[in-house]
Amino acid sequence: MDNLESVYGIPFHGEEHEEPGEEPHGEERIFSTTDSETFNIKGSYNVNGNLINKIDFNYRDSDYTLTEDHEEGDHDEPHDPGEEEHEPTVFLNNAVEYGASFDISNSDLSQNIVVNFVDEDNSIFGEESFMNPANSEEFTVGYYISKDFDLFNVDVGMRLDQIERSGSVTDEEHGDVDYYNVDDSTNSFAASLGRDLSDNLSINIGFASLERLPSVIELFMNGPHMATGRFEIGDPTLGSETSENFDITFNYEKDGFYAYASFYVNDVNNYIALIDQEEHDEEEEEGEEEHHNECHHEEEEEEEGGDPHPHPELICSMYMQEDAEFDGYEFEFGKSFDMDSGVLNLSFGRDVVNAKFSDGHYVPRINPSRNVYAM
């Protein structure tokens, strides 16, 4: 049983442009409080039968709460009774997961069959309830097989997911609610080939074809999210995301010195990304332009006296799909030194990822390159 609570602050938003004669606006900080409760059960039953050797089972029940609240940056000035108060926003995630792994290995092959079920509820309440309550159910069946030959080792894995996501989207202007239900299956496959080139050097080559359905956030998001500074809009018509990944890895170890290097290329069809509209105007197709204009149309109506979009200062961002290619590498090398009172380990590593859409512009929100030093 785990219970974790934390509080952290998100930096002040940047100051907005102020017209001449306007009173300066105080900065605003968003504080987040998380509360996570998890109950886990794991076990194993030794069958020792003709077909099944043992069964590993697991059960997990988790409740996660994230509360975002606002605090004005200027604490010295007295509070203005007419000033707008910000109510907290509460994000709730309740999930139940259970499954089992059946070991059916024999003297020639290592084999496992895995079944798993997840039932997850997501809901948001408060001032920034930018998504209606949504539910996701996933049933997974997987098969893994491994064979060690004299010259190399082969690993193969296959997975079938049956997924159902249900939710709704509320029209910001008219208040109409549209209900959606996504019920589909995905298939994934992965294989790797490994070989020892010498007593100290080994190589592993892998290929994977993966399919992923959009999450409830990507499907049903529709509203302001102050923590990201965006008015985020999902798309219930998003399709599955498929990727093909090729990677090659080298490992070396001798006399306390170790090193590894990995290179990969990943082609993704219908990659799902949150795109800021002001950076995507020229690339949008006709259907996407209509959706984009709808977001800006709300801002225009607010200027005319209405208030369908209460946060026109936020960047309008939409979940979209476009083919993309990822490539990158990572490596690490180091050495261990035996000391009188222990072992000293020194290492250096670096990882780099490049990601571009098919038309050449960069995929947003990709982790920057980093160097890692350790002692």
Residue ranges with predicted function:
Residues 33-208, 253, 260-263, 325-336, ...:
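Face-selective signature of the C-terminal outer-membrane beta-barrel domain
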Residues 18-28, 38-39, 70, 74-86, ...:
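Extracytoplasmic loops and strand-loop junctions of Gram-negative outer membrane beta-barrel proteins
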Residues 264-267, 284-290, 295-375:
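Gram-negative outer-membrane beta-barrel transporters
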Residues 249:
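Small/polar-residue-rich segments within soluble enzyme cores
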Residues 1-4, 9-14, 21, 252-280, ...:
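Glycine/serine-rich loop-strand microenvironments at binding/catalytic pocket rims
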Residues 19, 162-175, 181, 199-246, ...:
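Surface-exposed extracellular loop regions of Gram-negative outer-membrane beta-barrel proteins
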Residues 1-34, 49, 66, 175:
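Periplasmic-side early beta-strands and strand-to-turn transitions of outer-membrane beta-barrels
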Residues 31, 237-239, 321:
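Short Gly/Pro-enriched turn/cap motifs at secondary-structure boundaries
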